[in-house]
């Protein structure tokens, strides 16, 4: 069994396991800055893509802490060390507006993983489910992220 096959099996065992994170309150200042950066007018509610785009409210990793593909070490606890990660699209459902002070809770789980063969070799397609809700459980955004994970290119 190849290393990629082993990773696939390890990720498959995690399907359905939910990790819950309290992201804390959303700040109007943060989502209004996001709106301006995205070319939208700032408003009283967060832009639709705000929650699915922000991994946390902190400053994030420094440039030297990023891997060569530009990702940090946030991989939802998956064993993806040594693999290159690429986004492969999102499906989003918007349920309720996000306003200043809304305390956001995120639940993350693996929904699916598939080992595929491409022209340049094998790769994994991983579907992650991220559900954002307020502290009372009211759904805000449901996000299905598709990721491609492939071995580092030979040097």
Question: Which residues make up each language-model segment?
Answer:
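HotDog/MaoC-like acyl-thioester-processing domains
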Residues: 1-12, 89, 94-155
């Amino acid at each position: 069994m190849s290393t990629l096959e082993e990773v696939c099996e390890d990720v498959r065992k995690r399907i359905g396991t939910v990790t819950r994170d309290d992201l804390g309150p959303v700040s109007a200042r943060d989502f209004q800055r996001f709106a301006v950066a995205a070319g939208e007018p700032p408003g009283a509610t967060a832009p639709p893509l705000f929650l699915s785009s922000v991994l946390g409210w902190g400053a994030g990793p420094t440039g030297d802490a990023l891997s060569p593909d530009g990702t940090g070490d946030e991989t939802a606890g998956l064993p993806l060390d040594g693999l290159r990660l690429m986004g492969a699209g999102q499906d989003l459902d918007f349920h309720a507006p996000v306003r200043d002070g809304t305390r956001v809770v995120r639940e993350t789980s693996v929904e699916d993983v598939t080992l595929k063969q491409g022209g340049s070799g094998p790769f994994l397609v991983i579907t992650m489910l991220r559900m954002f809700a307020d502290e009372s459980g009211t759904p805000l955004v449901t996000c299905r992220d598709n990721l491609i994970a492939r071995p580092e290119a030979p040097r």
